[in-house]
Amino acid sequence: LRARPLKNEDFDELFAVARDPLIWEQHPSHDRYQEKVFRDFFRAAMESGGAFLVLDVKTRYAIGSSRFVNLTADEVEIGYTFFARRCWGHTYNKELKHLMIAHAFRFRETALFVIGEDNGRSRAAIEKIGAALDPEAPRDGAVRYRLAKAAFGAKGF
């Protein structure tokens, strides 16, 4: 896969992926498949300055998106990730997370993942890469997982 900064002109291609309701069924915002709702999501992604369009290198078509958000001195959140259903069960998410985490750890000590409490699919994926559930974090409909730079290097997923 290839990840590059998201651009305004990517809206139509990314919405073609995002308009599948099943992508959003476990996300806190179940209605992101609707164009108006996705347009707001896309606008926030652009405003974040850390959003990426994820492309399949073979087809050169968009297959998803993710972004860096909420930078602090030690930590960066990686989130708002979604992929076309045809990518589920393959290595796309793992590859993307590896790229993003490796990049983040050039500048920060910890990667944070905030996931909807009922999003079993995303929680399982993050646990597979070695992120640990933060039992001290507030439970506000979301759970927080953290991955330390030292653990990432040791795990080498």
PLM regions with names:
Residues L1-H90, H103-F105, T110, E117, ...:
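GNAT-family acyltransferases
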Residues F113-R123:
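Conserved beta-strand-loop-alpha-helix junction that forms the acyl-donor binding cleft
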